[in-house]
């Protein structure tokens, strides 16, 4: 389990694939606390190679930023000993979180996808082995069809109250949502397109962090 994890600005990588390494580094330089390497569809070998590149670039840009692998516990386990990889984010159909913890060790960061109250309650059974949950979608999103109804701002307070671990909002989240989402009690914003398509990903990440922090100080 990670003692210090900054979830305020959490980049989930996506298209365009050729920009992933540069955008990840820029977001890290702007204060993104987490970068999740996700690039679907992608082969395991290509994901591994991409993760190594992202990890090196992020470490150079901001050593405090944590780098996670999407879904593939095996890739995370293979890379963690020698690269700047810190854990994994797993979905409902991926490896059981307890097994992931056994494989990755006590210091790894493990996140789990949720998005409904029953899923949050189920995730609480893993509160001793996961570090946070992702909850969404906030809005309908073209990057991932979860089959779940959008939560909107009104959907998060109940999930935050029910969860035994920090909650990260995801699903067409943008910088301008930071203050409103912070008010719901979430620990941070997971952003895909907003950062990936930003003209200045560093400035975008800085904006998310500052707006989220200012809202929590009110």
From Swiss-Prot:
GO terms for molecular function: magnesium ion binding; thiamine-phosphate diphosphorylase activity. InterPro entries: Aldolase_TIM, ThiamineP_synth_sf, ThiamineP_synth_TenI, TMP_synthase. Gene3D superfamilies: Aldolase class I. Its EC number is 2.5.1.3. Pfam families: TMP-TENI. GO terms for biological process: thiamine biosynthetic process; thiamine diphosphate biosynthetic process. Condenses 4-methyl-5-(beta-hydroxyethyl)thiazole monophosphate (THZ-P) and 2-methyl-4-amino-5-hydroxymethyl pyrimidine pyrophosphate (HMP-PP) to form thiamine monophosphate (TMP). Belongs to the thiamine-phosphate synthase family. This is Thiamine-phosphate synthase. The gene is thiE.
